[in-house]
Amino acid sequence: MNAIIVTGGDIDLSLLENYIAENKEDVIISVDAAITKLEKINVTPHIMVGDFDTLSDEERLKKYENLNVEIVKHDPIKDFSDSELAVDRAVKDGIRNIVVFGALGKRFDHAFANILILQKYKKLGADITIYDRYNKIYVISNHFKLEREKLWGKYISFFSLEGKNFMDKLEGVKYPIKNRIIDNIATPSLYISNEIKDDKLEAAFSGDLLVVESRD
């Protein structure tokens, strides 16, 4: 079982609508006011999670309760964002493959926290991918292969989530790398905007890396 989490950031509604249409068996979780975006594409979620501070509409919540949507309401004063609570709910339900729409947008603090959430739950056995119109973002551990035809856009970038990682090899790309340190302080931009040149990319490295597949 997989989950689609829809949060309150910027969303390409056509991208979201197409993804939901292609993954009809997935559990859909709406976070706080993201329900207004799902309404625009006529999608009813299975679960709604949040403190609903940006959706002070009891009538709307009652409507979804009557549609047998599970409403999980949290106190606005809490130690976790609504997005993290939605991910946590999915993981506690045994879901290990999660995609998130709306995790990026105007609020960089929320966007950055959402990226860090990827690593937290990777260590708990869950694979989470953030999508927007231009980016596909996820965490990988130790080794990685990606076929060129499956790349989200033209570019692929790698970032350390541990301060430093050792890259044994990065092959099949425009800028191959062998036996180098990925260092957020010394070389923060060394691993950005690479391109797959062979049929596939292959990488071997220590620890966890954040991967960003991008298009212009």
Where are these regions (language model features)?
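Short phosphate-binding loop-to-helix
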Residues: 71-92
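A glycine-rich helix N-cap at a beta->alpha junction
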Residues: 67-75, 125-129, 154-159
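N-terminal beta-strand-loop-alpha-helix module at the start
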Residues: 1-64
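Long, charged alpha-helical interface segments
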Residues: 140-216
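Short Gly/Thr/Asp-enriched flexible loops that form oxyanion-binding sites at enzyme active sites
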Residues: 108-119
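General beta-strand structural signal in soluble alpha/beta enzymes
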Residues: 6, 29-32, 72-73, 129-132
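Class I SAM-dependent methyltransferase SAM-binding "motif I" and its flanking Rossmann-like core
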Residues: 119-148
